[in-house]
Amino acid sequence: MPRAIRGVLIQCEPAIKSIIVHLDSVNNDIIIEDLDEQTLVVKENMVQLLKQKLEDRLKETYRPEEPLADSD
């Protein structure tokens, strides 16, 4: 008997998609189907965890420049 898995369609930039694919490569528990360069189907019950992991990863990699001190 076939089983169905509830999924959510995610459309994002290729850079974000590559992070999601990397996160999934550890346990293969997030992505149901990789559709194209900007689209994935992910497990519905993993969406909140995925958002949190993406936020953490982006905080690690994105560091805005600190404002320069005024040198009078």
From Swiss-Prot:
It is found in: Nucleus. Its main location: nucleus. Disulfide bonds: none annotated. It comes from the Eukaryota. GO terms for biological process: nucleotide-excision repair, preincision complex assembly; transcription by RNA polymerase II; transcription initiation at RNA polymerase II promoter. It holds the Pfam family Tfb5. GO terms for cellular component: transcription factor TFIIH core complex; transcription factor TFIIH holo complex. Keywords: DNA damage, DNA repair, Nucleus, Transcription, Transcription regulation. InterPro entries: TFB5-like_sf (IPR035935), TFIIH_TTDA/Tfb5 (IPR009400). Belongs to the TFB5 family. PANTHER family: GENERAL TRANSCRIPTION FACTOR IIH SUBUNIT 5 (PTHR28580:SF1). Component of the 7-subunit TFIIH core complex composed of XPB/rad25, XPD/dnr-10, tcf-30/SSL1, tcf-29/TFB1, tcf-11/TFB2, tcf-14/TFB4 and rtf-1/TFB5, which is active in NER. The core complex associates with the 3-subunit CTD-kinase module TFIIK composed of div-66/cyclin H, prk-3/KIN28 and rtf-2/TFB3 to form the 10-subunit holoenzyme (holo-TFIIH) active in transcription. Component of the general transcription and DNA repair factor IIH (TFIIH) core complex, which is involved in general and transcription-coupled nucleotide excision repair (NER) of damaged DNA and, when complexed to TFIIK, in RNA transcription by RNA polymerase II. In NER, TFIIH acts by opening DNA around the lesion to allow the excision of the damaged oligonucleotide and its replacement by a new DNA fragment. In transcription, TFIIH has an essential role in transcription initiation. This is General transcription and DNA repair factor IIH subunit rtf-1. It comes from Neurospora crassa (strain ATCC 24698 / 74-OR23-1A / CBS 708.71 / DSM 1257 / FGSC 987). The gene is rtf-1.
